[in-house]
C-alpha cells in the first residue's frame, strides 16, 4: 500500500492539534503510522483513499474525527478569467484546469504537493499513462493558455535546468524524459503554451522553470490531462480539496475550455436501519447524523451528500463503512458463537503450509499480492472484470499469480530472482488455491522449473507427470503441463510478454493448483 512522508509540525499546523492527539486519532482513519523518526512520520494509507496521499488530505479527515471541522469542506467556487484553448490531442484527449487562490506555501507544503502529484501519477494515473498533473504559478503565466502540439526542436527550460534546451534533448538529459516520452508522439508532443509563447510543460513528461511553484506563490493553477474523462475529473477534485487546506479564502476558480470540469456533489440515499443491521449495532438518528458529518459528509432528507474528492464512495455500503470508522471499531459488539466444535486443519491448509516450507528451503522468497489486480493478468489468462473499479490497479479478479510475480521481479531489478506466492485465483468460475513461483536469471530454462516441481512433489509425497503444452505467452516448445495429484504448468516466458511487463531478464514460471 502507498506510504507517504509527512512532517509532524505540518500535521499539527494543518489540524490545530498536538501530535499526541493526532496519533490517537489514527485509530479512526484508514491509515497507520509505519515509522516515527522524531520530526517526520511515514504513514501507510490505502489505495482507495487517494485523498490521503498527502498531509492536507489526512488533516481534513482528522479534523472531522476530532470535530474541529465537520460536514462538507468549505469551498467558494467561481469562474476563472483564464481561458484554455485546446486542440484535439488524440493520445491525451481530456484536459481540465482550476485555480486555487490565496494559498500559503512553504518548503514542506511544496513537498506535500509534489508527493500528492507523484502518488497519484503512480497509482491512479497508472504511471502517467492515464492521467498527468501539473502545478503552475498563476502570476507567471500570460493567458490564454493553449493545449497544443509543439515540435521536438522547440526550446524551453525544463524544471531543474538553468538554460533552455531543445525538447528532444530533454528526452535524453532527464530521467522523466527517458521514462515518459515513450507515452507520446516524441516528434510533436502535447504541451501547454501561454499567450507569450513560453512552454509551461511538455505533457506528461516535465514542466518548465518559467512558471514553477515557489514559497512566494499565492495562486496555483492545476492542470490534469489524460485518457479518461472521469479519471481526469476525479484527480482534479482531489487536488483542489488538498490545496484548499492551504488556502485562507477557500477560493477555487474553474478554467473554462478543453473538456472542462464540473464540481458536483454525489447524493446517496441511505436507509439508517440497513446501516445499523449491517454494522450489528443500533445507531440513533442523531448519532447517525453526527457520524456522517464527522466523516466530512452532509445529510439532507434521507440522502448523504458526498464531496467530489471522495471517489471511493460508490454506494450506501461505503457510507456504512465510514460510519463504522468514525464511530470506532471498538464500539462494535463482540460475541463468541455458541457452537461446540472440534477444529482441525483443512487438507488444503496442511498442503499450503508444507508447500511454503518447501519453497523457502529451496531458497525462494515469499510474496503476498492482492487478489484484485490490473489488466496485465490478461497476458496469461482470461480474468473476471470488476464492474465498477475504484482504481486502474484493481480492475480484475486474478486468474493467475504469474503476472504479479513478473511485475515484482521487474520492480526488484535484480539479475537473479527466486520468488513465490501461495494464494487464491479464480479458474472457470471457481476459487482455487494456487502456488506460483518464478526463477529469473540469465540462462534460466524450463529445466530449472521442472527441477523445482519434481523436488516439491517428492517432498509432499504427491505423484505428478509432465506433458508438452503450448500457450501464447510461453516460448514455443518450452512449456510443460503438470498432471496427477496436483495440476498446473511450467514455462519459459515469451520475451514479448516480459517486455510488456517491463522485465528484461530470462524468466521461468510455474503455477500449480493445490486445493
UniProtKB/Swiss-Prot annotation:
One Gene Ontology molecular-function label: phenylalanine-tRNA ligase activity
Major place of residence: cytoplasm
Cofactor(s) in the UniProt record: Mg(2+)
Entry keywords, A to Z: Aminoacyl-tRNA synthetase, ATP-binding, Cytoplasm, Ligase, Magnesium, Metal-binding, Nucleotide-binding, Protein biosynthesis
Gene3D superfamilies documented for this protein: 3.30.56.10, Bira Bifunctional Protein, Domain 2, Phenylalanyl-trna Synthetase, Chain B, domain 3
GO biological process: phenylalanyl-tRNA aminoacylation
Entry's EC annotation: 6.1.1.20
Main EC class the enzyme belongs to: ligase
Location of this chain's protein in the cell: Cytoplasm
InterPro entries xref list: aa-tRNA-synth_II/BPL/LPL (IPR045864), B3/B4_tRNA-bd (IPR005146), DNA-bd_dom_put_sf (IPR009061), Phe-tRNA-ligase_IIc_bsu (IPR045060), Phe-tRNA-synth_IIc_bsu_arc_euk (IPR004531), Phe-tRNA_synthase-like_B3/B4 (IPR020825), Phe_tRNA_ligase_beta2_arc (IPR022918), PheRS_beta_core (IPR041616)
Residues annotated for Mg(2+) binding in this entry: 312, 318, 321-322
Catalytic activity annotation: tRNA(Phe) + L-phenylalanine + ATP = L-phenylalanyl-tRNA(Phe) + AMP + diphosphate + H(+)
PROSITE patterns according to UniProt: B5
Highest taxon listed in the record's lineage: Archaea
Residues of the B5 domain: 263-334
Quaternary context: Tetramer of two alpha and two beta subunits.
Family membership noted in the UniProt record: Belongs to the phenylalanyl-tRNA synthetase beta subunit family. Type 2 subfamily.
Protein name per its UniProtKB record: Phenylalanine--tRNA ligase beta subunit
Natural source organism: Pyrobaculum aerophilum (strain ATCC 51768 / DSM 7523 / JCM 9630 / CIP 104966 / NBRC 100827 / IM2)
Gene transcribed to yield this protein: pheT
